[in-house]
Structures are given as structure tokens and as C-alpha cells.
Regions:
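Short, intrinsically disordered, charge-balanced linker/junction segments flanking boundaries
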Residues: 194-202
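Conserved N-terminal helical subregion
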Residues: 2-9, 16, 26, 51-195
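Glycine-rich FAD pyrophosphate-binding loop
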Residues: 26-46
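Residue-level detector of alpha-helix initiation sites
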Residues: 15-16, 41
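Residues forming the Rossmann-fold NAD(P)(H) cofactor-binding site
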Residues: 19
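Conserved hydrophobic helix-helix packing surfaces used for dimerization/oligomerization
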Residues: 9-11, 32
């Protein structure tokens, strides 16, 4: 299919991936429509690590300053045995780390990261943000794609990007790779305010 550049690119999913894709397209002056099935743009979950590569992406998207204001940049990273508490290894993530990789290592809450992305998308006149818009079906018609939403609407675009998560309906129709496979690994996580963090951890 040859894309129709007169139509916007449709993006199914208004999470971190979908909003980042919309901003990247806007950098190239390509309009897009972000379709989120929820009633608002929210991200559940806990913390997420921000390595040097993603910080370089933030710079390209023009959101690095907003991220730096709310992310936390530790000077050290420790890995301890979950049962004994014994230190396994330690990584210096301070100035030497920044010099070596050209960007810092940080951590941020997934919801805070999405807030920055959503605000950046909403401030762009090239990005249309739609909530309560769940893609049910899509069809390629000549040089454009048509999507049908759960509430009966129809939208047209030059292409369709699937950013609708692990249970993606679009991916299942294109790749047909089956349901996600449980890895068998379990992670215990918690979110605390800085005032609740023990002093020795700080």
C-alpha cells in the first residue's frame, strides 16, 4: 500500500508508545490522530527506568526539560539479594556515567512520564487526541486505511500504527501471533513518597 500523505496517520493507543509516536511524527510535520479507548489518558503501574538512550530520544522530541523537572537521578544503583539483603553489585550512575554515555540514568513514575507526553501532544496543532475511541476493525482501501471504532465511528488515515498494548487487537489481526505468554516471573514493586523512604536508601 502506498501511503496517502494528505491524510493523517492513525495511532491506536494513547499510552507512552502511542503519544511518543505522535510526537515523533509531528517532528517531521506529519499529522496524526491518537485514539485511546479509555475515557482519559492515564497510565497505571509503578516506576520505570530511564536509560541514556531514552534521554536522547526525549531531547529529539523536545520534552527533556519537562522530564528533568520530575524525574529522579540517583548517584548510585544497588542490586541486593531479595532474601538475604546482601549486596550483589553497585553501579555508579553519577557524573562519570553521564560522561561515558552522554546522558543520565534516571527513574520516573509511568503516569508522570505519560503526563508529559500527553501535554506535549495536546500543545501540537499536528496531533488530534481522542478518548473513548477503541479500534475494533480496520481495512486497507487503495492508498489509505479505514478504522471502525467500538461506538460505530469510522476514521480514515494514510497508515495505522498499533500502540494498543499487550492485548493489541490490531497486532493479532496482522501478525496473528496468539495470546501473550506468561513468563513465570513475578516482580514485587511499591511506590513511596520520598518522606517514607528510609534514610539509608536515600
Amino acid at each position: 500500500m502506498t501511503p496517502n500523505t494528505e491524510k493523517p496517520i492513525l495511532i491506536a493507543g494513547g499510552g507512552i508508545g502511542g503519544c511518543a509516536a505522535a510526537l515523533a511524527l509531528a517532528q517531521k510535520q506529519i499529522p496524526s490522530i491518537v485514539m485511546e479507548k479509555a475515557e482519559e489518558f492515564v497510565e497505571i503501574g509503578a516506576g520505570i527506568q530511564l536509560g541514556p538512550n531514552v534521554h536522547k530520544m526525549f531531547i529529539k522530541l523536545g520534552i527533556e526539560k519537562a522530564i528533568e523537572e520530575i524525574a529522579f537521578y540517583p548517584k548510585n544503583m544497588f542490586m541486593n539479594d531479595g532474601i538475604t539483603g546482601k549486596l550483589i553489585t553497585q553501579v555508579d550512575t553519577g557524573e562519570k556515567f553521564r560522561e561515558r554515555f552522554g546522558a543520565p540514568y534516571g527513574v520516573i513514575h509511568r503516569g508522570d512520564l505519560l503526563d508529559v507526553l500527553v501535554k506535549a501532544c495536546e500543545s501540537s496543532n499536528l496531533i488530534t487526541m481522542l478518548t473513548s475511541t477503541e479500534v475494533e476493525e480496520f481495512d486497507e482501501i487503495e492508498n489509505y486505511v479505514t478504522v471502525s471504532t467500538r461506538d460505530g465511528r469510522s476514521l480514515q488515515g494514510s497508515a495505522l500504527i498499533a500502540a494498543d498494548g499487550i492485548w493489541s487487537k490490531i497486532r493479532s489481526k496482522i501478525v496473528n501471533d496468539g495470546n501473550p505468554i506468561v513468563s513465570g516471573h513475578v516482580a514485587y514493586r511499591a511506590v513511596l513518597s520520598i518522606s517514607e523512604v528510609p534514610e539509608f536508601v536515600k
